[in-house]
Amino acid sequence: MTAKGQMLQDPFLNALRKEHVPVSIYLVNGIKLQGQVESFDQYVVLLRNTSVTQMVYKHAISTIVPARSVNLQHENKPQAAPASTLVQVETVQQPAE
């Protein structure tokens, strides 16, 4: 798993876990699982419903759909710049020799 993948997955799954958000998990074979994220690591997600906890391998997951929106802002991390922020990049060409 790339660092970028973990930077996206971990905060999302952790917010779902902490906020006890009900989720629907669609597997690559089309099966729909429902429950709450109990725990997760690099390879699996533990999904709890009323009767059982299931271990779902991440490579089998197609989509995770939360029942409501989740807040991914963290107090410890600086907030991203607003979308309207413009960055000017200046290029300087070296004279030909």
Swiss-Prot record:
<keyword id="KW-0694">RNA-binding</keyword>
<dbReference type="GO" id="GO:0003723">
    <property type="term" value="F:RNA binding"/>
</dbReference>
<dbReference type="GO" id="GO:0005829">
    <property type="term" value="C:cytosol"/>
</dbReference>
<dbReference type="InterPro" id="IPR010920">
    <property type="entry name" value="LSM_dom_sf"/>
</dbReference>
<protein>
    <recommendedName>
        <fullName>RNA-binding protein Hfq</fullName>
    </recommendedName>
</protein>
<dbReference type="InterPro" id="IPR005001">
    <property type="entry name" value="Hfq"/>
</dbReference>
<dbReference type="Pfam" id="PF17209">
    <property type="entry name" value="Hfq"/>
</dbReference>
<feature type="domain" description="Sm">
    <location>
        <begin position="10"/>
        <end position="70"/>
    </location>
</feature>
<dbReference type="GO" id="GO:0006355">
    <property type="term" value="P:regulation of DNA-templated transcription"/>
</dbReference>
<dbReference type="InterPro" id="IPR047575">
    <property type="entry name" value="Sm"/>
</dbReference>
<dbReference type="GO" id="GO:0045974">
    <property type="term" value="P:regulation of translation, ncRNA-mediated"/>
</dbReference>
<comment type="subunit">
    <text>Homohexamer.</text>
</comment>
<keyword id="KW-0346">Stress response</keyword>
<dbReference type="GO" id="GO:0043487">
    <property type="term" value="P:regulation of RNA stability"/>
</dbReference>
<comment type="similarity">
    <text>Belongs to the Hfq family.</text>
</comment>
<comment type="function">
    <text>RNA chaperone that binds small regulatory RNA (sRNAs) and mRNAs to facilitate mRNA translational regulation in response to envelope stress, environmental stress and changes in metabolite concentrations. Also binds with high specificity to tRNAs.</text>
</comment>
